[in-house]
Amino acid sequence: MASLNKVMLIGNLGRDPEIRYMPSGDAMANLNIATTDTWKDKGGEKQERTEWHRVVMFGKQAEIAGEYLKKGSQIYIEGRLQTRKWTDKSNVERYTTEIVADRMQMLGGRSGGGSYDPPADRDHDYQSQSTPPAKSNTGFDDMEDDIPF
């Protein structure tokens, strides 16, 4: 049987993206995204739980995140979970599980609203351009704004 490693999040940035550059010159962005679940307990009281997610993105997508995203920005992310091993300053091996973003869409307000899908082949450059949204074929674009009621 095949396996699936897919994450989809809609949340808000807890701080501005942290942008770094790898030795190859490619950009890398680290984001902290908060998602909040709400429910009512047995007594009818509203309850909330916020979960924080570490997200990393690379290349042109990382550059776009650094330029347009700020603390509080609402964002949609698609990606996969990945665990990496690293050594801290005390020479202790550590593990971090994070979401590697394959797709990002900025949500809410005029400062967001764009999307970026990276090229399908990750071994090549990240120089593709995002395309503007396709024009709607619903026919509503030609309708007048005067509502008859």
From Swiss-Prot:
- UniProt-listed GO biological process terms: DNA recombination; DNA repair; DNA replication
- Enumerate the transmembrane spans: none
Q: Which PROSITE patterns match?
A: SSB
Q: Does the keyword tRNA processing apply?
A: no
SSB domain location is 4-108
* Source organism superkingdom: Bacteria
GO CC aspect terms: nucleoid
Looking at the Swiss-Prot or TrEMBL record, what is one Pfam family this protein matches?
Answer: SSB
Keyword entries, A-Z: DNA damage, DNA recombination, DNA repair, DNA replication, DNA-binding
For this entry, the protein name equals Single-stranded DNA-binding protein
The record lists the organism as Nitrosomonas europaea (strain ATCC 19718 / CIP 103999 / KCTC 2705 / NBRC 14298)
* Gene from which this protein is expressed: ssb
